[in-house]
């Protein structure tokens, strides 16, 4: 809740503050403030599965592009953004960027993110990430897996992460597989 403003036709009726309106001769509506200063970490699995091309571009490149766009929006909204890349061990952890002027720093760091021929170690990577985060964060995890064993290991690691953080798991859809 930020402030009260005079109700105008077309506003959502659920925003009317009936107690404040009862004290005056006009209707007043609540104005809510957007949450700011959230910590968002874009985590990238740089393992072998992320090298598979989707429409001619590796999955990791599509993930990085999507994350940079979302990071720019988050920075404009007043949130803090970091990048984290891993394969068999953590490879990249940027400090949190705090405003949109720092987006070039994130772009430079993102340019170093590339896939490797190694299998990802979700347990080590996500435990390292958890240890580095001092407060509750939103973690957007870009990954893909081809076999049930990898999926189980990833789910176990994410379960531990979810105890303290919000986690969104993102995969890049392959249109060719969807058509089958």
Which residues does each predicted region cover?
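Glycine-rich loops and low-complexity Gly/Arg-rich segments
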Residues: 42-45, 65-69, 106-111, 119, ...
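An amphipathic, basic-hydrophobic helix/alpha-beta surface used to engage anionic
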Residues: 1-101, 136-143, 149, 156-160
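Feature representing long, continuous alpha-helical segments
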Residues: 65, 104, 108, 124-127, ...
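Von Willebrand factor type A / integrin I
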Residues: 134-135, 149-180
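Von Willebrand factor
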Residues: 102-138
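Short, flexible loop segments at the rims of nucleotide/cofactor-binding pockets, characterized by
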Residues: 19, 115-119, 147
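Short secondary-structure boundary/hinge segments and terminal tails
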Residues: 92, 128, 178-179
């Amino acid at each position: 809740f930020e402030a009260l403003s005079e109700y105008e036709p077309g506003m959502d009726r659920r925003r009317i503050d009936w107690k404040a309106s009862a004290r005056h001769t006009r209707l007043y509506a609540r104005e809510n403030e957007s949450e700011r200063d959230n910590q968002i970490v874009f985590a990238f699995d740089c393992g072998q599965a992320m090298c598979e091309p989707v429409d001619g571009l590796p999955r990791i490149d599509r993930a990085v592009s999507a994350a940079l766009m979302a990071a720019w929006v988050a920075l404009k909204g007043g949130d803090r953004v970091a990048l984290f890349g891993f394969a068999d061990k953590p490879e990249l952890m940027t400090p949190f960027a705090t405003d949109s002027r720092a987006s070039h720093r994130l772009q430079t760091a993102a340019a170093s993110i590339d896939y490797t021929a190694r299998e990802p170690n979700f347990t080590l990577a996500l435990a390292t990430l958890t240890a580095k985060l001092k407060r509750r964060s939103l973690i957007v995890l870009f990954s893909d897996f081809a076999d049930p064993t990898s999926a189980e290991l990833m789910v176990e690691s994410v379960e531990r992460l979810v105890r303290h953080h919000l986690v969104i798991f993102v995969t890049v859809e392959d249109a060719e597989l969807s058509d089958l």
